Amino acid sequence: MELVCTYIESENFEKTVEFYKKVLQIEPNEFCANRWVEFECGNKLSIYNKKYDEDKINNNINYNEAYIKNFNKLKSEKKNNIVTFNFYTDNLKEEYTRIQNLDLGLVSEIMYVNIVEPYYYFNILDPDGNVLEICSDNYE
């Protein structure tokens, strides 16, 4: 088994897609207008617009009963939101400045950890509150 794609279920689809376009500096592949896009950034990172399916379900189109039951169940369940997306860059100092200049929101200070090996990183949040950790093995 292999992980082929990670989905972010977005409540702010357009804003989240724009955020990742700026951060990743690439255009996504569009598979279904306004339902999901996919970024090729090492592995695949997809942004999924739940409102698209919700609108279709309300019109009773495109889905079987099992999907609708699961979709509605997932809406009511409390979720664990503790996920960190880890991105690597060769030049952390340059990337830190670039991300700050995009003015996408709060950017943490650069942090340093040395447990197994030196590790430098900073965090930003996407419009849905997911943590992006941008890291490097040096900060020169």
PLM features per residue range, with description:
Residues 18-19, 93-98:
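Short amphipathic alpha-helices within nucleic acid-binding modules
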Residues 1-2, 76-82, 116:
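Short glycine-enriched loop/turn motifs at secondary-structure junctions
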Residues 33-35, 81, 115-120:
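Short acidic/glycine-enriched loop/turn segments that link adjacent beta-strands
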Residues 27-79, 131-136:
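Conserved short beta-strand elements that form part of the metal-binding/catalytic scaffold
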Residues 14-27:
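Amphipathic alpha-helical segments
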Residues 87, 96-140:
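Vicinal oxygen chelate
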Residues 1-17, 83-85, 135-140:
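N-terminal beta-strand motif that seeds the catalytic metal site of vicinal oxygen chelate
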Residues 24-31, 106-110:
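Short secondary-structure junctions
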